[in-house]
Amino acid sequence: MALLQSRLLLSAPRRAAATARASSWWSHVEMGPPDPILGVTEAFKRDTNSKKMNLGVGAYRDDNGKSYVLNCVRKAEAMIAAKKMDKEYLPIAGLADFTRASAELALGENSEAFKSGRYVTVQGISGTGSLRVGANFLQRFFKFSRDVYLPKPSWGNHTPIFRDAGLQLQAYRYYDPKTCSLDFTGAMEDISKIPEKSIILLHACAHNPTGVDPRQEQWKELASVVKKRNLLAYFDMAYQGFASGDINRDAWALRHFIEQGIDVVLSQSYAKNMGLYGERAGAFTVICRDAEEAKRVESQLKILIRPMYSNPPMNGARIASLILNTPELRKEWLVEVKGMADRIISMRTQLVSNLKKEGSSHNWQHITDQIGMFCFTGLKPEQVERLTKEFSIYMTKDGRISVAGVASSNVGYLAHAIHQVTK
């Protein structure tokens, strides 16, 4: 009897633990799916092939395949360190010099909206955080519609950002997989049918994931139909300067819409064009009817931000602000960002040239027609799978590659592999 009682006492904690697990507050929580891009990176890391290529990651690499910190960023960091600045909280709306410089960069120094002060810009946590602030603002104050129309396809994070803010997602045609180019006719048809006073999201430049941008004449037609339908245009500008190498050219569409009197909101990121990926520097801007309205909007944006994260991070904003507001650093940045854009453009040209040398009979012109970091190659999922298994070349299943991950030393290998799986 004593032995039995002893065993019962010993087993009691185990039964209690099992019961606790079964009745856990979180027992209903299912394992979520892995991030598709991070999954590509993990598989790449496990590969032992010396020729392996990771074309999934959305970060710039130099021609040696190494991560790159801009010289102007290094100089700005040194200047900040020398000043021995404090680590106090930033204001809720962010670093004032940074937000003003961000607005000037996006809108242009001669912009009527900028010069008249009929805008408000708040600092956000890079592009994602700025988009989320914007989404929450629209959810609370845009009373006309809950619908946000995204191009098909769009950046994968757009859907959860707007959905989790309580908005509803719709789509308009954008990319034609048959031609690997813009479905302009489809886009115009769909946008012309969007209910009035809805929200339409537009990629200002270097559309992610396709790399397909409208031409300026097409942007004019798009602006015309957006204005006719009385839509609110939400511009996502994550690549200003990084697309064409020209900050003004990359902001042309945004500025044209504003000049046409279209209501616009904007999210910016400095992850790509300044290489400040981990610093999380970004901004959200609302173009208003006058300066008084801008003050009211700013007051509500600060009320929204306060329970989200209270104050934005300091370091990235200081770096970006110093670069944008210091003539010598700004000049150096413009040269460096053009250098990054030019290298990507060169890799596109070299890839097509090497495909021709391989004897490929396919038309690869879309690779050079597209712009920015990403390229929709037109490769099918089974071809992508072969590239991974046979050549250790990693990319997302939709055939999107980060051209920034291609270098002079391996562009020939990539072309050879693509030819082998497409011939």
From Swiss-Prot:
One of its GO terms (biological process) is glutamate metabolic process. Substrate binds at G58, W155, N208, R400. Its cofactor is pyridoxal 5'-phosphate. It comes from the Eukaryota. Keywords: Aminotransferase, Mitochondrion, Pyridoxal phosphate, Transferase, Transit peptide. GO terms for molecular function: kynurenine-oxoglutarate transaminase activity; L-aspartate:2-oxoglutarate aminotransferase activity; protein homodimerization activity; pyridoxal phosphate binding. The keyword Transmembrane does not apply. Gene3D superfamilies: Aspartate Aminotransferase, domain 1 (3.90.1150.10), Type I PLP-dependent aspartate aminotransferase-like (Major domain) (3.40.640.10). Disulfide bonds: none annotated. PROSITE patterns: AA_TRANSFER_CLASS_1. The modification N6-(pyridoxal phosphate)lysine is found at K272. It holds the Pfam family Aminotran_1_2. CDD domains: AAT_like. Its EC number is 2.6.1.1, 2.6.1.7. InterPro entries: Aminotransferase_I/II_large, Asp_trans, NHTrfase_class1_PyrdxlP-BS, PyrdxlP-dep_Trfase, PyrdxlP-dep_Trfase_major, PyrdxlP-dep_Trfase_small. Detected in heart (at protein level). One of its GO terms (cellular component) is mitochondrial matrix. Homodimer. In eukaryotes there are cytoplasmic, mitochondrial and chloroplastic isozymes. Belongs to the class-I pyridoxal-phosphate-dependent aminotransferase family. This is Aspartate aminotransferase, mitochondrial. It comes from Gallus gallus. The lineage of its organism: Eukaryota, Metazoa, Chordata, Craniata, Vertebrata.
